[in-house]
Amino acid sequence: MCIRDRVLVIDGQGGGLGRQLVSALAAACPEAELTAVGTNSLAANAMLKAGASRAATGENAVVVNCRRADVIVGPIGIVIADALLGEITPAMAAAVCQSGAKRVLVPINHCENYVVGVPDQPISQLVAAAAQKVKELCSAIG
């Protein structure tokens, strides 16, 4: 069970993946403190409506919340500067990479970044797998 684990979901653009992740994580780890940070307000609002405990927007919110998180979840682009059509700044990518948190990255092949060796799967399967991994990590942490 995810008791008091701090799970941070980061997404950008329209927040569609983040919304799905938040919804799945809220079901898988109902006791987790689920924070959503969007690179823009549209993404943040989508994740908040999906069940995040709280949401914030922007570079500083990513940096601050990465320091506080036990687990960070999002598309693989959150560790690549200039990914998500330029929404991920170098400071955001560095904050995710340098965080002491465990990272669960969803392999989305978009924006000129490709993950080889991972078969293409529907987003719903990737989201379910990510939620399961976070649940396992939360059980190990808690």
Feature annotation, model-predicted:
Residues 1-5:
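Conserved small/polar residues in nucleotide/adenosyl-binding loops
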Residues 6-41:
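Glycine-rich phosphate/diphosphate-binding loop of Rossmann-like nucleotide-binding domains
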Residues 10-13, 37-40, 58-60, 75-77, ...:
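Fold-independent oxyanion-binding glycine-rich loops
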Residues 19, 23, 27, 49, ...:
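Short, well-ordered alpha-helices that flank and scaffold nucleotide-derived cofactor binding pockets
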Residues 31-32, 98-103:
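A short helix->loop->beta-strand "cap" motif at the edges of active sites that frequently abuts
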Residues 35-57, 113-116:
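N-terminal beta-loop-helix "entrance" segment that forms/cooperates
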Residues 54-92:
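Glycine-rich phosphate-binding loop
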Residues 105-142:
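Short, glycine-/small-residue-rich phosphate/pyrophosphate-handling segment
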